[in-house]
Amino acid sequence: MKTLKFNKKYYLPILNGDKTQTLRKDNKRLNEGETVKAVFPGTGLTCKIRILKTGYKQFQYIDDEDVKREGFHSMVELENELLRIYPKCDRFTRLYYYRFKVL
């Protein structure tokens, strides 16, 4: 089974259904309908998620729906988190999205 790593701070938001998408700079080659093991390094915590939709968009086209799916309260919050993780992002950077649900 493929794995997808998440920061431990996202464990509860994912389990609670508050975070239903992840944006990544790298293409993780996950397919719609695929079951994946979500891992939270350093915690021993895992859960299974099903990939519902995949795609990509440029950083500049992140919208309010992405903010909600990512579990953030504002565009600024999400942009700051993405820039913390990927400091070399600019508005043209391609980000892959993976929408999912916990099984």
Ranges and model annotations:
Residues 1-103:
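Structured alpha/beta reader/binder surfaces that contact nucleic acids or chromatin modification marks
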